[in-house]
């Protein structure tokens, strides 16, 4: 809103003669506007003839002037004013003759009237509440932007200065009415004097009419030259300095032709101005004096001007006698404007029909000019009492996951028609308008298990997510205590997903997942709503009917808020065929509503939901109203036609009914959002119905009053049950943007529709402005079963002005809290918000951004980021910084999980002096604080005290203790209530001394009124009844015994007793006594070197000095009543807190000591570590509490609102941030977020960013002619076996090891006489699987990236059982992969798929190496290169692609062509070619000088790889393709050599020189030929034993046998699958109830246990407290030996089969033998020897410790084989280490050796 408030308002010079249209609009606006200033102008306009007569009576010279112009103008306006209808009077202007030279007596007052009317219309257009004075807001805004208190904010030129004076002199809009009247009268007088001077001059023989023209010169001329020419014409003069190169010249009309010709000859451009008479000339001096006499002499006279004579004279001189220095004045004004901190444009409002802002100033950067206008008037719409506000909205439609994206589709006329996503309908091809990600769901956010999500209809899942965003956009989460009285009305038609669920084995989730009642029920259940929850099915009109029911429910009181809309997802091919068979759908393309080529509708899917609330409630509660549903209506077609065809009479009747309910005329509706499905029968009927009601020929149709019709189905198809709400959302977006979008696919009208007469109804073919002052639309939705629903939606009423208009100027920083259920969602939201800020078309202030975010964040979610920003650019930088962590975890620690909030204790301080620390800035800014302070002030005044405003803001001492205590209480109360109103959950309150009275009120013991009675009455007694000795108090740093001894010793020395008043801390106490006694104590304490401080209290409280008021105070305490506390209160009593509150205890509280330390420690003992928050400011109470606390886990928060060096609002912001970081859900109460933003922003703000994963249950086919395997297959080599089962986000691919492509690739490469998979083959298979999961990315732009690929157990020719590829999604288009079989894990890493068109280059490609300067030391032709490889591998000729290679010490450059064996298969060609690329690095390694003949190099993995789309399709493009390969040795670590390889396309094509592949960090391990031979043999030998042959593993990598794993690991997997709990979070001690299991989950796990273990386990509600360990034990007790827990023993006969992914927990499941092995002592000498052996295989110089992990030391599969051999040589132990876990340490390896029983040999030095 602030962006549209002008910094300067400029009133132009005397108007040109207005056009008839302008006069018409002016008269209509003056007639119909209720604004006070226009009522006054209307009255003076009607009285012009009478005023003119009085004026003529005062000046004889006016007698010669004609009365006709004024009388004619008045009479014309009078006819217009008394006319009944606008249409009747629009043509009654013929008698008003508009001449080019109207007299000044008419033009001058008309100028002021136009200025005031345009200004008034501008105020109306701000969208602010009529009850607020918009003019006041304008004045404050322009004042706050001006750097000086002196200088105008309203500027006027010539007659315009009168309008500016009226605006500037008016503090309110009511005052403007008086000043506008004065300005019009004054303009009449000025015009009369100018006209009379013209008439007098005409009597001269040399008279010539004075006229004006503008002169503008360029660079080849100058002002001096112009002035020199003017000197030749004595009567000509400069009247206005318009710009630095432009002036207005007034001259006799007879001189003008020659003068203008002279100027033009010198290159000066001239333009005439229709102003007649002599303004800005000294000859008008007498007229000036006469005017001053007329307007200042008689306050009761008709021409009195209430501006003061000096001010009036200044204005009159600027018009009559002095040249106008307009350019200087405007330059000074513009320069006085303070630059906006957020670099928002400076805005100037220009009023009048003549533009007068100097062009050079108008062209300044970031200078935005708004020009006043007079548009046709409209009567204010009176919203019915039953009006329903739309306060939130969200959607998900084809191509649009947000409302902004949906508008982009509408505005561009896009069509989302296309084929269904792959696999949606099996192998069938279906066209329509589809969501690309209907299977995606954020199960974690909604607390739904992955397995349950799998069985849920996607309509339920998508409705949940869209509901969350709609509720979020409504500000529901911004409320500290959201109301649960919310209804949920969802329209749902088909439930296609039933086919998917019913074709699979029934589960406990099958019914709840497919029943349509659960679509609405789940939403209500998640939000804990108690209002009606209803699913509605009226076919295609379901969502509109749901909105109708929701509005009715609110009106009837069934709920106070409602969520309404609809959802439609298609997944059943038979259902689609059924609809097609009915002849409804269009088989030729998209919907074409009302078009000549319409042949039926195309189906669509999506979801749209809106949040509704009664309009009156929404406005009073400050909700952001996006639009208003003023009426809804439903009926049924009368049956006169086919049931699926609409009936004209039924539809037109419905329109009339809904108009009647809305109290609207048909002409008020300017847009009809039709059902418009594009059918030949339905479209003409609907069009005719709309035209009959909204476009009748008898209705007056101005050009701007055109009625448009359209249908959203042209863009997104017929979304059936979600179609009605789609139309509603379209209207909301049209209201936001003020535009009517084009109808997609429309070229010509359906010939069956009769053409409209006089353009009554139009169909937009381009984006058009919605040219109505009041915008209303009717949405029609028809159901195929005959239901008609109509909804009228109109613009929201004006928004109320913020109660604190200068809030934004007082704030320097805003706090931001970003929350989500997962880290991924937090970061995605940061990115989305940063992009919104960067691309938002409307200027957004930091305050608006804060408001938007504050109202939408759900503070109860698990993860959060909190920070402050002082400018919009800083906010963007912080958001971008946090968002980048999503890709680079080194940038930032991940978003912290929301902490378990410590109990919060509110601490109220005592009286610390006679001054207060209360900030006016905080009071002005905070709605919550101000509301509570005002409440206290009102009650205090009712009790007879004066208001404490504004004295309470002063930091001067308050002498009257009654005022002091009432203020102190009010401040503490207001601060505490501000925190509570902001949603702070308080567990305990505690008050020190006086603060305990406030704490009693906040806790609920005392009402506010009773508390003030007690506080004020007590203060009155202290002031009036206290003894002569006031007393004094002294703080002493000494322990309790010392304080009591000091008090006793002083009391024993004289009559004055000393008491301990406050036990503040272990070493902090306050003594109280007479002034003399305290002075003596202070002296003695100083002698004893004790730290003391005299307190600035007014009296000696908590001492015998209080006795003087005790009796009367007791009487007072008996007057008030005491309640049980709502918030627990800890009283500062000695041994225990008060159980009940009595008058006696309250009275004694003022007399007895304050045992604050004791009370604080009791709170700590009861609640544990707490957050201690001060209720007030700078009292030091929380610091005292800190001294008494024993645990460092307590957290202290204190506001510093009175420090002169601290911005008080910043202190509130900082404290809020501290509380957020401690896990609190409190809001920042320093300002009211709803005041800072316009509702239109809420339709564009990004919603919650879901962390989704696919959940789609395949539909088993019943067609016996089709394959029983529904899995998509690619060339037979790799097939998708399972998706998202049993683990979420996991896709499992089976590999056909007998496929020809695999055999063909391996056939041409022999490694040491055997087969070993090349690294390229692993990459190829993984790439293909990733491509299958990202079919939405065109292959032509699909970019594949790998990270951290590592070969664990190499593969060869051995056919392995269960060989599969597992991909687990970790991010969008990013998967962690594992190639594994039943016996081993073979390769791991990460694969990422990007779209080359949109992705940025990976980091490792940011700086490519320069190979141009490499010096060649050795070159080898093709044959020599392969000869070097022969000691490792031999390649058949057809598989060779290396043409030549050149090398030096660390670099190799080679040329590679496509090998002949590539054939026609892209997969085969890419794999074989990629293998040739990798050979370049291997050849370089083999060629090094220190390479031994018995050594070879094997690649075990790499760091990062990027494969371009060009390379992936190279084999298809050109059989003669060649590449240039550059390789460099980037690092050398012992036996490990790292290489980087870059491949560029060679040749002369357009792709030449482009990067095909980049591979960095390839690890080549130097190993012996014999070690590699072992690897080859192992990879080619059938029936390998997976883990050990003779040695059992140590406890650190104990793994269950196949049978035992089926209890623990399968149980854990089942629980993970059903609850969504992460595997790593499930331990034996995990309690079932803590995993979020409900009754359905219990039923499902019982069924799954029966299915897996064949045992019957019943889990009762009592068992919900059981642990996972107990459940496993119960299963074990019933299982057969094949399923039982089998202990793993450490002897040579034990053979184990390991699951690489599941380890036993360290729990009671460990066997006895395992425990004994764990307890074996480790021998230091043996450990050293093992470490030395390992070190020889590492060779990196890194220290090898017992805790060192083998994996981190670089021991890959090849190195492990050599280590295995060396262990046998050194220790006589044969161990197989290939299956060791990645966490295996040196200590674990040592334990393996020890368990072989060879310690004796080692100790005897056998090795």
From Swiss-Prot:
O-(pantetheine 4'-phosphoryl)serine, modified sites: 1639, 1757
Cofactor(s) the protein requires to work: pantetheine 4'-phosphate
Domain Starter acyltransferase (SAT) residue range list: 107-280
Residue ranges of the region described as Disordered: 1690-1720
Enzyme Commission number, as recorded: 2.3.1.-
Known uses: Chevalone E derivatives produced by this cluster are interesting candidates for cancer therapy since they synergistically enhance the cytotoxicity of doxorubicin (DOX) in both MDA-MB-231 and MCF-7 breast cancer cell lines.
Residue span, PKS/mFAS DH domain: 1272-1573
Domain (Ketosynthase family 3 (KS3)): residue spans on this chain: 385-795
Active-site residues per Swiss-Prot or TrEMBL entry: 540 (for beta-ketoacyl synthase activity), 675 (for beta-ketoacyl synthase activity), 718 (for beta-ketoacyl synthase activity), 1304 (proton acceptor), 1475 (proton donor)
Class of this enzyme: transferase
Annotated Malonyl-CoA:ACP transacylase (MAT) domain residues: 919-1176
Positions of the UniProt region annotated as C-terminal hotdog fold: 1416-1573
Low complexity bias (residue ranges): 1692-1710
Pfam families documented for this protein: Acyl_transf_1, ketoacyl-synt, Ketoacyl-synt_C, PP-binding, SAT
Region annotated N-terminal hotdog fold, chain positions: 1272-1398
One function term, GO molecular function aspect: 3-oxoacyl-[acyl-carrier-protein] synthase activity
Carrier domain location: 1605-1679, 1721-1797
Entry keyword set: Acyltransferase, Multifunctional enzyme, Phosphopantetheine, Phosphoprotein, Repeat, Transferase
Domain notes for this protein: Multidomain protein; including a starter unit:ACP transacylase (SAT) that selects the starter unit; a ketosynthase (KS) that catalyzes repeated decarboxylative condensation to elongate the polyketide backbone; a malonyl-CoA:ACP transacylase (MAT) that selects and transfers the extender unit malonyl-CoA; a product template (PT) domain that controls the immediate cyclization regioselectivity of the reactive polyketide backbone; and 2 acyl-carrier proteins (ACPs) that serve as the tether of the growing and completed polyketide via its phosphopantetheinyl arm.
Protein's UniProt name: Triacetic acid lactone synthase cle1
Organism (species): Aspergillus versicolor
